[in-house]
Every structure is written in C-alpha cells, then in structure tokens.
C-alpha cells in the first residue's frame, strides 16, 4: 500500500514541528520509578517521566509535549487525525465543539494541528481525535453504555479513559505500570473526571462488560500476556485489542495474533481478527495492525 505524496509531506511536517516543539524535563525531575520490565514502554524514559509526574515532580503543563511522552502516546499523525475527524463528523460532530472534549484535548499542552488541516472546527491533537473516535465507536457498537465499567490495559496518559467517561460515563479500571496508573489518575482528576477512574489494585475481580487495549497487550512478553489473560481478559464479556504483534512479538517474546486468538479461544473467548473496519486508520493498514475482538 503506497501513501500519497501529500500524505507523506503532511506527516513529515508534523514530525519536524514535533521535534522543534517537544519539551524535555530536567534530569532532576525524571525520578527513577523502579518499575518491573514487562513491556516495551517499561524500558523507555516514559515510565520514569510518569513516575515523576505522579509524585508531583512534574507539572501537567507541557506533559504531553515532553518527548518521552510523545514517543509513546502522542503518536497519531495529522493524516490519521484527519481520518478520525471524518469518523467523528459521521458519528457525533457535536463532540468536536464540546467543552469537556476541549478540556481533555488541551490538558498537558500537546502539540495541536490546525483545524483546517484536520477538518475540525479548531486545532486538535491528532491523538485526541483517535481517542474520541474510539469512544464514539465503542458506544455506537454497544460495547459501552451510560455508567459501564471497562478495563483498559495500557492506559497511556489517560486520554481514552477520559473520552469514555465523557461519551459514555464509563468507569475505567486502569491497568499499567504502577506509576503510569497513578499518572493517568492524576490526569483524570485534573480534567474533572476523577470519579471515572480507578487503579488496578481496586478492582475486585468480578466480570466486566469490556476490556480494551490499544496495542499494549501485544507489546508484552508471553508470560505477562498470560498473567493478564488470567487476571483480566477472561473476565470480560467483550474485548477490543488493537494489535501490532507483527511488529513486536518476535522482538520481546510475545505471542503472534494467531497464538493470541488460539489462547483466547482455548480460554472460552470467541475471539477473531479483523484487518479492516471503521476504526482502523490509514497507518494501521500500512503497518499491518489489526483488531482482535470478541
């Protein structure tokens, strides 16, 4: 699949601007977190920056502009951002001017792209648009309703949990490295959505309507994947896992998509793979990313 020259230029401009505007915390602020190396992200500065933020060593202003954060969670470019903006216009255009969505988008001072280039009424972080489109997709497909509970594995800065709170009033149990969980809860509190999030240690192990994961489950080694299956996945009536196992499985000793699906089915989950649907964006297709769901 070849990309249009215009798309390549557009995303290249985003990368150049991002490199110029990204911030870097002072070394004294990036406290060592001591997290267990269980994933791709646990080995990167991202985990330490989240630990510092969770402990009050970093302010929220500029958090999403920090290079260590952008490398992990602000990865959606403007071409994909425009794709998700189109989905939002189809599924709920009023949300593009909603003040709660604006508060989530501007929290942490992310690099935002002009609305006329994204097809939105104002500037947005392209990553915000993906989270908003995902939350709308989950609701319109019946996975979440008002007040639903959801487990999110790999919570990032808390953006999707915040969107699910805004769109569906959902309560998210965040599952990640401890310092990342605490960082995400701080974000939810600062955006007025704190009652919609809880730490993984607060979950009682009961069944839940949905477990979701944007890439994170497929960026774990097989041992941790098995732990997450037994602890979380098998308790969910439905699951949505955006998978890039084709990129990471062999590198970190994780399962391939076929192996994951076989494990899920052996555990009683009617899981299948989709390589095309309304939520997978242009870069997902380009990189061979798919969706595992049951």
Model-derived segments and their meaning:
Residues 220-232:
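A short, conserved alpha-helix within the catalytic core of class I
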Residues 157-169:
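Conserved SAM-binding loop of SAM-dependent methyltransferases across substrates and taxa
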């Amino acid at each position: 699949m070849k990309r249009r020259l215009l798309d390549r230029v557009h995303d290249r401009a985003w990368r150049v601007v991002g490199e110029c505007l990204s911030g870097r915390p002072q070394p004294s602020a990036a406290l060592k977190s001591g997290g267990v190396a269980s994933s791709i992200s646990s080995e990167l500065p991202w985990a330490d920056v989240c630990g510092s933020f969770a402990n009050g060593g970093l302010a929220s202003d500029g958090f999403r502009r920090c290079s260590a954060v952008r490398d992990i969670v602000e990865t959606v470019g403007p071409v994909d951002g425009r794709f998700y903006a189109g989905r939002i216009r189809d599924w709920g255009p009023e949300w593009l001017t909603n003040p709660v969505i604006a508060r989530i988008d501007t929290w942490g001072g992310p690099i935002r792209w002009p609305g006329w280039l994204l097809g939105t009424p104002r500037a947005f972080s392209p990553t915000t648009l993906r989270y908003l489109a995902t939350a709308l997709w989950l609701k319109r497909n019946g996975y979440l309703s008002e007040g639903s509970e959801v487990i999110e594995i790999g919570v990032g800065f808390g953006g999707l949990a915040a969107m699910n709170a805004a769109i569906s009033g959902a309560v998210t149990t965040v599952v990640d490295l401890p310092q990342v969980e605490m960082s995400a809860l701080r974000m939810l509190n600062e955006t007025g959505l704190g009652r919609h999030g809880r730490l993984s240690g607060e979950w009682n192990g009961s069944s839940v309507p949905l477990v979701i994961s944007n890439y994170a489950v497929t960026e774990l080694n097989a041992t941790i994947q098995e732990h997450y299956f037994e602890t979380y996945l098998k308790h969910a009536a439905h699951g949505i896992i955006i998978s890039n196992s084709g990129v990471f499985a062999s590198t970190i000793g994780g399962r391939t998509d076929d192996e994951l699906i076989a494990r899920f089915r052996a555990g009683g989950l009617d899981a299948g793979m989709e390589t095309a649907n309304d939520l997978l964006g242009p870069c997902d297709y380009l990189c061979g990313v798919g969706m595992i769901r049951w």
